[in-house]
Amino acid sequence: MILACHNLNKSFGDHLIVRDGSFHVEDREKAALVGVNGAGKSTIFKMIVGELPLDEGDVILTKGKTLGYLAQHQNLDTTNTIYEELKTAKSDIIALEAQIRAIELELKSLSGEELTNRLNTYNRLMSEFESKNGYAYESEITGVLKGLGFTEEEFSKPTDTLSGGQKTRVSLGKLLLTKPDILLLDEPTNHLDLNSISWLETYLLNYPGAVLIVSHDRFFLNRVVTKVIEIENGSVRMYTGNYKDYAQKKQMIRDAQLKEYLNQQREIKHQEAVIEKLRSFNREKSIKRAESREKM
C-alpha cells in the first residue's frame, strides 16, 4: 500500500464533503475517484496533498515515497520555452551530467592517489546517471511532448505565449517526467485530442507507480483503472474493477434499493388498508387493533 486515507471528515460550514471516508491505493495500482460535480473529488485531492486541512482523519503516504499532483490550474516559469520547462523535471540528471563532464576535464591533469579518488567518484556518478536512464532523458522529453500533441516546431515556444490548454499539457508532461511513486491527476484528458488521450492511456498503463485519477471521461477510466473509489453524499465506497464494472455494480445496488423501497411502499399501503378496514367496523376492539397497527 502506498496511500491510505482513514476516516476523513471535511465540511465547509453546513455543507458536508465527506464523513468518516476511508480508502487506500496499492503500489502500482491505477484507481479512479468518482462522484457527481460538487461531490468533493478535488477537495479530497487537496486534502491528500496538504493544500486543505482535514477536519478529522489521517492521510498516510508510505515513508520514502513521492507524490505528484496535477491540478486543473498550473503555474509555469514564463521565461522558459516548452522544452526548457520539461527539462526542469530532469534537473537531477542534468546536474549529474554536469558533474561527470567536469570530472572528465579534471582527470587529464591528475595522477596517483588523487586520480584514483576522482575516478572512484566518477564511476559512482556514472552508475547513478545510468540507473536514472540519463542517456535517454532528452529523447524521453521529446516522446512525452509529441505524445501530448506538441510538434517539434512548438518545442521552442515560450510558455507565456501558450493557451490555457497548452499550459495544462506542458504541466502534465512535466509531472509525468518526474515519475513520482503515486500520481494524482485531476481531469488529465482535458485539452487532449483523441491521439493524445490514447497515448496517455498507454503511458499510464505502463507507468511503474500508482495513479489516482479524477476524470469525467468514463471511456478513459474504463481502459486505465482497476479500482473505483466513489464519493456520494459524503460517504466513500470502493469498487474493484474498471469503470464499466463499477457502473454495473452501482446499477445493481440502485435496483436493489428501488425494490426494497417499492416493497416498503406496498407494505405501508397494505397496513393502511387493514387499519381502514378495522376502523370501519367501528367496534372498540377493532379500533384498538387499528391503533396498534398504526404504531408499527
Write out the residue ranges for each language-model feature.
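Short intracellular "coupling" helices and adjacent cytoplasmic loop segments at the cytosolic face
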Residues: 110, 276-288
